[in-house]
């Protein structure tokens, strides 16, 4: 684990002391090396799949998320260059330092060996993200979005802190492996339902579950490109990772507590998918689509079957790659047309034909075209939900149809139709942008060929 963490920490002095003309090149090249090195964690050597020491461990659940975090850092750095073009060198350094410090916190969170350490790092990720949104966002509403993001996440996670202190007092330890391997770790009492709610609330807000999702579209729409990418790909997955870790400990005592939340998650998927159909703002549409996909992950995690766990883990990785690609594509349009309104940026297929190909591939991946990893994860979740209740098949089937409709609606709105007059003077695309798209799509294609790498601990 340290072979990834220490080089990432060393990015901080590299960014601080590089000359201004070498700063982007050094940080991009070095972070690409780190992401290549992180691929080694996918190869679990021991029988249990645990690379373990006293502070950090990786297993088949955390490894894919670690690799995803490392993989997206160079892409975020490359994607931000145009956005920061007119900023001073000091501000550029500050931006990159915030991104790298966020990356360090995420790497430590996904490999934390104790729940309290995970909680502290979970909260630490708030600070750099908030600064990135509030300082480098696009519109003045960014301060409002930052406040929503901060208070939703903070208020949701305070009960978790109380629950962890209570569990520490009862069990004497918050070690993830120890609690996972202990049969029935928590005593059965009337307060267990409250304990379950306290533990889950932080993660359900972070996912976010429908009903607690109001902070997400605001944060996504106002964040700069790197903020949107890290938020969609990794910060939402902190919630899913937390649920998958803690649900095993809470499992025997409060199985009934999960039922209303499974129903809310499946209903929320339909609602947010329907909201996508009437969006005019491109980034807002992609943000609501994230809420819909995360509803699938919540439902699959709470059903607690091996297929559900595998589907949830695969969906988190597939969604991380697909939604960041869509946000990056939306940003290429925004950089040229200075608008996110889909009516104003239609007909771009004529001007940017290669970018149109990336739009097509990203939209098809988002709707779960066979044989992509998105479809594999969706099928696993549908099977596990069907085993829980036959009626969920209606809701999940309807959600799949609506997802296909809004993905194609997004594609046709942006790429087809009559061009607007201000689209005629659009700048051509850069090789850098095409490389970012290729590096999003390449893992999706490779994981389609070998999905067992990201199916998690239940495989």
Curated annotation (Swiss-Prot):
It catalyses: a ubiquinone + NADH + 5 H(+)(in) = a ubiquinol + NAD(+) + 4 H(+)(out). Its main location: mitochondrion. GO terms for cellular component: mitochondrial membrane. NCBIfam families: NDH_I_M. InterPro entries: NADH4_N, NADH_Q_OxRdtase_chainM/4, NADH_UbQ_OxRdtase, ND/Mrp_TM. Keywords: Electron transport, Membrane, Mitochondrion, NAD, Respiratory chain, Translocase, Transmembrane, Transmembrane helix, Transport, Ubiquinone. Its EC number is 7.1.1.2. GO terms for molecular function: NADH dehydrogenase (ubiquinone) activity; ubiquinone binding. Coiled coil: none annotated. This is NADH-ubiquinone oxidoreductase chain 4. One of its GO terms (biological process) is electron transport coupled proton transport. It is found in: Mitochondrion membrane. It is a multi-pass membrane protein. Belongs to the complex I subunit 4 family. The chain crosses the membrane at residues 22-42, 65-85, 96-116, 117-137, 146-166, 194-214, 230-250, 256-276, 284-303, 308-330, 350-370, 391-411, 435-455. Core subunit of the mitochondrial membrane respiratory chain NADH dehydrogenase (Complex I) that is believed to belong to the minimal assembly required for catalysis. Complex I functions in the transfer of electrons from NADH to the respiratory chain. The immediate electron acceptor for the enzyme is believed to be ubiquinone. It comes from Tachyglossus aculeatus aculeatus.
């Amino acid at each position: 684990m340290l072979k990834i963490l220490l080089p990432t920490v060393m990015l901080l002095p590299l960014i601080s002391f590089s000359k201004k003309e070498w700063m982007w090149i050094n940080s991009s090249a070095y972070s690409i090396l780190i992401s290549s090195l992180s691929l080694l964690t996918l190869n679990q050597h021991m029988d249990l799949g645990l690379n373990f020491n006293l502070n950090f461990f990786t297993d088949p659940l955390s490894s894919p998320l670690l690799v995803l975090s490392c993989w997206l850092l160079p892409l975020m750095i490359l994607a931000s260059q145009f956005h920061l073009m007119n900023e001073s060198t000091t501000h550029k350094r500050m931006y990159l330092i915030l991104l790298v410090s966020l990356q360090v916190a995420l790497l430590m969170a996904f490999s934390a060996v104790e729940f309290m350490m995970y909680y502290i790092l979970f909260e630490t990720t708030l600070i750099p993200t908030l600064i990135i949104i509030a300082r480098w966002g696009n519109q003045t509403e960014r301060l409002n979005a930052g406040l929503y993001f901060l208070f939703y996440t903070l208020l949701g996670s305070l009960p978790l802190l109380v629950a962890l202190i209570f569990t520490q007092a009862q069990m004497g330890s918050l070690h993830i492996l120890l609690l996972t391997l202990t049969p029935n770790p928590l005593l059965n009492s009337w307060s267990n339902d409250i304990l379950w709610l306290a533990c889950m609330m932080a993660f359900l807000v972070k996912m976010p579950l429908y009903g607690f999702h109001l902070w997400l579209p605001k944060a996504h729409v106002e964040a700069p490109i790197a903020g949107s990418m890290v938020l969609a790909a990794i910060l939402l997955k902190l919630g899913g990772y937390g649920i998958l870790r803690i649900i095993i400990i809470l499992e025997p005592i409060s199985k009934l507590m999960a039922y209303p939340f499974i129903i809310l998650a499946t209903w929320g998927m339909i609602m947010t998918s329907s909201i996508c159909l009437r969006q005019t703002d491109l980034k807002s549409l992609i943000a609501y689509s994230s809420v819909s996909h995360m509803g699938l992950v919540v439902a699959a995690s709470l059903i607690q079957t091996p297929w559900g766990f595998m589907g949830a883990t695969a969906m988190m990785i597939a969604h991380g790659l697909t939604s960041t690609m869509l946000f990056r594509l939306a940003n290429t349009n925004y950089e040229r047309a200075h608008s996110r309104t889909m009516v104003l940026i239609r007909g771009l297929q004529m001007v940017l034909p290669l970018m149109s190909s990336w739009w097509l591939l990203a939209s098809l991946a988002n709707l779960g075209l066979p044989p992509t990893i998105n479809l594999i994860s969706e099928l696993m979740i549908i099977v596990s939900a069907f085993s829980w209740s036959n009626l969920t098949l209606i809701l999940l089937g309807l959600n799949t149809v609506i997802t296909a409709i809004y993905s194609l609606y997004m594609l046709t709105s942006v790429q087809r139709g009559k061009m607007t007059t201000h689209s005629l003077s659009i700048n051509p695309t850069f090789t850098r942008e095409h490389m970012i798209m290729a590096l999003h799509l390449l893992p999706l294609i490779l994981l389609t060929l070998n999905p067992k790498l990201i199916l998690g601990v239940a495989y």
